[in-house]
């Protein structure tokens, strides 16, 4: 039995979500909508990827459909989600345009016949979920939900382990974040955020992020205890979180490592990784974990004040969690 899904927006996340879905036998993508990419271009963009490499399966255009590994996927080019035909057969929609991020806007998919919508971005008003952290809060009456951000997906599992074991009094997060599609290749206008308009390939760019504060939405008692910022760097993929926290309970760095390793092998297996290798960013391209703790990179100032480092493939890891969230809610809804 599979859950039939649709993808709205065939950009970076939309395409990687499709790749990730092909590895999950419980998900079948049956429709893709993107008004800016025609069918032949979809074939090309899915087949070739500068970061994740050439798609190892088969992909072609046939009879007006995108055929991946022999399975046809209906293709549409509607600008308004409510205009996507109800006959597409997709009960669950991954909203990955980056445009429709509120319950009202993403909810337009429901008009077209969808049962549920997962926004692949933070949302101002939709309930946010992080796999491994707060899935138990989902209920079947929720129609539009958010998978939060890639950075929140990296930070929240790590913060959960530390808070559960030692208690977090307060903390600051910095994410050293890979370039994304919204940045400029060369200097250009960028509204009120002047720094964001500087060339992505030539600069380290300080930026705001709500990722740390969003942890308070998925772990409510941490609300107000964490905040953070970002540095956008000239790196095509893989980012890293630097979490500096003050602990309630004194702990050696060895104690902290042991707690994270235990979680990575137990309750958070497949979500939170653990490594003691001498790793760098490219070692995590294509890693499906939400967060990979770097045991050798962290430092402790004293038993109550520590800096923790965790890597994440901000494209592939995040997209894998979108698929996991889809499967989870489908099971709760009785669709799987």
From Swiss-Prot:
Matches recorded under Pfam families: Gp_dh_C (PF02800), Gp_dh_N (PF00044)
Metabolic or biological pathway: Carbohydrate degradation; glycolysis; pyruvate from D-glyceraldehyde 3-phosphate: step 1/5
Main location class: cytoplasm
Residues annotated to bind D-glyceraldehyde 3-phosphate: 149-151, 180, 209-210, 232
Reaction catalysis annotation: D-glyceraldehyde 3-phosphate + phosphate + NAD(+) = (2R)-3-phospho-glyceroyl phosphate + NADH + H(+)
Active site per database record: 150
Subcellular location: Cytoplasm
Gene Ontology CC entries for this record: cytosol
InterPro entries named in the record: GlycerAld/Erythrose_P_DH, GlycerAld_3-P_DH_AS, GlycerAld_3-P_DH_cat, GlycerAld_3-P_DH_NAD(P)-bd, Glyceraldehyde-3-P_DH_1, NAD(P)-bd_dom_sf
UniProt entry keywords in alphabetical sequence: Cytoplasm, Glycolysis, NAD, Oxidoreductase
Swiss-Prot/TrEMBL site (Activates thiol group during catalysis) positions: 177
Gene Ontology process terms (BP): glucose metabolic process; glycolytic process
Family as reported in the entry's similarity comment: Belongs to the glyceraldehyde-3-phosphate dehydrogenase family.
Subunit organization: Homotetramer.
UniProt protein name: Glyceraldehyde-3-phosphate dehydrogenase
Source organism of this protein record: Rhizomucor miehei
């Amino acid at each position: 039995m599979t859950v039939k899904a649709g993808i709205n927006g065939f950009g970076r996340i939309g395409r990687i979500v499709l790749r990730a879905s092909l590895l999950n036998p419980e998900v079948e993508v049956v429709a893709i909508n993107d008004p800016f990419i025609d069918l032949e271009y979809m074939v090309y963009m899915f087949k070739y990827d500068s970061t994740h490499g050439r798609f190892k399966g088969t992909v072609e255009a046939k009879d007006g459909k995108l055929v991946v590994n022999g399975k046809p996927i209906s293709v549409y080019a509607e600008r308004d989600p409510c205009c996507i035909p109800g006959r597409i057969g997709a009960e669950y929609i991954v909203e990955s345009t980056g445009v429709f991020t509120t319950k009202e806007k993403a909810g337009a998919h429901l008009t077209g016949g969808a049962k549920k919508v997962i926004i692949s971005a933070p949302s101002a008003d939709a309930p946010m979920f992080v796999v491994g952290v707060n899935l138990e809060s989902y209920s079947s009456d929720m129609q539009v939900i958010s998978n939060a951000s890639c950075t929140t997906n990296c930070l929240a599992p790590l913060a959960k382990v530390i808070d559960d074991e030692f208690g977090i009094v307060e903390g600051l997060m910095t994410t050293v974040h890979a370039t994304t599609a919204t940045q400029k290749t060369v200097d250009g206008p960028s509204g009120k955020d002047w720094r964001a308009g500087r060339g992505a390939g030539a600069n380290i760019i300080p930026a705001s992020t709500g990722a740390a504060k969003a942890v308070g939405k998925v772990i409510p008692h941490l609300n107000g205890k964490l905040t953070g910022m970002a540095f956008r760097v000239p790196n095509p993929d893989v980012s890293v979180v630097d979490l500096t926290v003050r602990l309630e309970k004194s702990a050696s760095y060895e104690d902290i490592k042991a707690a994270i390793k235990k979680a990575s092998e137990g309750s958070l297996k497949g979500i939170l990784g653990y490594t003691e290798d001498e790793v760098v960013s490219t070692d995590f391209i294509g890693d499906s974990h939400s967060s990979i703790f770097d045991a050798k990179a962290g430092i402790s100032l004293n038993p109550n004040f520590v800096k923790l480092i965790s890597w994440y493939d901000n494209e592939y890891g995040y997209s894998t969690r979108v698929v996991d969230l889809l499967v989870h809610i489908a099971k709760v809804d009785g669709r799987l």
